[in-house]
Amino acid sequence: LRTMSDGLLTTGVTSFLPTTLTSSYELLLAVTENIGARYKEATGAKIRGLYFEGPYFTEKYKGAQNPAYMKDPSMNEFRAWQKAANGLLNKIALAPERDGVEEFVRTLTDEGVTVALGHSNATFDEAKTAVEAGASVWVHAYNGMRGLTHRELGMVGAMYELPHTYAAVSYTH
């Protein structure tokens, strides 16, 4: 963490969210324990939270995410990770078509956690349901999501149509 923190500061970054990939529950727990115990030791860019990119994705638009660990959202898992992280887990990305997403998103956003949508084959309606529950960010716009067609607006159509959301596009890959 210190190496990342110091390196980021040399590029002008003053704060960041360490980010995970889809992994096993146990590995993610170890990561949250490590960051939760050491985040104050950052001597460069400050750690302002923790971002989980996964594991609640679907395989079709998996990108670099490991499908072996993709699953439906679990409040029990999230609570364990949040406890291990000392409350730092403040952003998570998921696929809106997973079972239980609406309640999961509503609970997390009510608690101040930012929910992002990506790595998903969701329909427009599935994405809309997640946004109405509180999701507010689109991850990997166009790349990690179902595209727009004349018969199904998909995630891309939802990204354009639904208000009060933010789309992130990476041009560095």
Locate the predicted segments by residue:
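Short amphipathic alpha-helices and their capping/turn segments at secondary-structure boundaries
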Residues: V31-G44, K128-E132
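Divalent metal-dependent hydrolysis catalytic cores, especially in the metallo-beta-lactamase
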Residues: R2-V31, A45-T58, A85-E97, V113-V115, ...
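N-terminal cationic-hydrophobic initiation segments that often serve targeting/anchoring roles
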Residues: G36-K40, Q82, M159-Y160
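Short, structured coil/loop segments at alpha-helix boundaries
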Residues: E41-G44, V101, L162
